[in-house]
Amino acid sequence: MAFSTEDQIKAMGFCHVGENCLLSNKASYYNCKNIKIGNNVRIDDFCVLSAGIGGIEIGNYIHIAVYSSLIGAGKIVLKDFCNISSKVAIYSSNDDYSGQFMTNPTVPSRYTNVTSSDVIIGKHVIIGSGSVILPGVTLEIGVAVGALSLVNKNCSEFGIYIGTPVKRIKERGKNLLELEENLKGSN
């Protein structure tokens, strides 16, 4: 995997990029002025980050794996220590599927009914491969989402969720909070 140089990253015009960031030069970044990236972030090949007016905020110690996408007009926030597995799609905007309106971004907005709502991915959240996160969803601290899940509702802290749509199946361990403190103490 080849990563962009510091000069290449600066030329893209991000709102902010922290230290020790590895941004694939095979990923696509749109509206970089609305994208903030913290420290110790890795974004892999073939990811798409398309920031709308709400922007995208990526915290510290975050990995976004291959073929994942963060797209929409609403704000998308990834808090510290998130792991977004491959082929995850996070949407902050949605077309109207009722048939009462036309769809897709090539159609003038007066004929469409796009809705947008913020998506908040809490600290220490892990989202499994192939999952879809819909607009307006908040995943609280420590949530784990199993592979191939559809997240259409908020998920409570330290829950493990799976399915289409997701349902909570059990409690997730909290040892990672102690490990976070150890990591912070070692820096």
Regions found by a protein language model. Give the residues of each.
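Conserved beta-strand-loop-alpha-helix hinge in the C-terminal portion
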Residues: 157-159, 165-180
